């Protein structure tokens, strides 16, 4: 398998100086960068490279394969002072640095909150449901079990190959909610506090490997199914 080299330099900055960046390329953790340092890493060649400074789907950059063996990436801290600071990704081309495009999640997040998922294409619906699940499951499983999209979410997780969470949800439903009509309503949530608490404990106990698999699966879905100018700019 052919590999390419990524040389990723984190420009020194005061904002967030003490926080290391966990770098992911195409969903795989490749290393950590401290303030003012460089990470050199070889990754398998791909048509698209999706870069992140964490695994929470907040900031990213996208590189289309340009048939080169070296990619020199610069991470700059932007914002801060009176606004939240965040990272921007640049690619060095000889004497210039060009900001990289990124995959934009706003349209998919808005579709969930505006209850308009059905207006998205099938592949977009899968992303919206899985993205919403990734946020909800980190807080409390009752958000997942009370969602009107519960059955669609499970199917979406199956579609992208997030099988650990599919198995965990199946186990939770079978063990704690097998005689309950889902999704849960407010009254059921109050009555089933113990079951919800036990379900949360089970999810949290297994969330490391399950979330890693989910993260990789979502990134793979993005790079394979949604890599078009409507989403990347």
Regions picked out by a protein language model, each given a short descriptive name:
Residues 60-63, 95-152, 156-233:
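Extended, alpha-helix-rich binding/interface surfaces that flank or overlap catalytic cores
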Residues 1-100:
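Short loop/turn and low-complexity linker motifs enriched in small/turn-promoting residues
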């Amino acid at each position: 398998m052919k590999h390419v080299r990524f040389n990723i330099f984190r420009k020194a900055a005061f904002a967030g100086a003490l926080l290391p960046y966990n770098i992911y390329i195409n969903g795989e953790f490749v290393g950590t960068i401290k303030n003012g340092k460089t990470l050199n890493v070889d990754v398998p060649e791909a048509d698209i490279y999706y870069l992140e400074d964490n695994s929470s789907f907040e900031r990213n950059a996208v590189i289309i394969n340009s048939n080169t063996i070296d990619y020199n990436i610069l991470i700059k801290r932007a914002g801060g002072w009176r606004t939240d600071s965040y990272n921007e990704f640049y690619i060095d081309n000889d004497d210039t640095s060009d900001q990289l495009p990124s995959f934009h999640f706003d349209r998919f997040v808005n579709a969930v909150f505006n209850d308009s998922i059905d207006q998205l294409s099938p592949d977009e619906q899968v992303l919206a449901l899985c993205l919403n699940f990734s946020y909800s499951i980190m807080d409390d499983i009752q958000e997942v079990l009370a969602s009107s999209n519960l059955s669609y979410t499970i199917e979406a997780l199956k579609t992208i190959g997030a099988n650990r969470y599919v198995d965990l949800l199946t186990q939770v439903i079978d063990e704690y909610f097998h005689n309950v009509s889902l999704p849960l309503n407010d009254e059921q949530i109050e009555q089933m506090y113990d079951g919800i608490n036990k379900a949360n404990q089970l999810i949290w106990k297994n969330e490391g490997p399950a979330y890693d698999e989910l993260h990789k699966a979502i990134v793979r879905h993005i790079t394979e199914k949604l890599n078009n100018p409507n989403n990347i700019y």
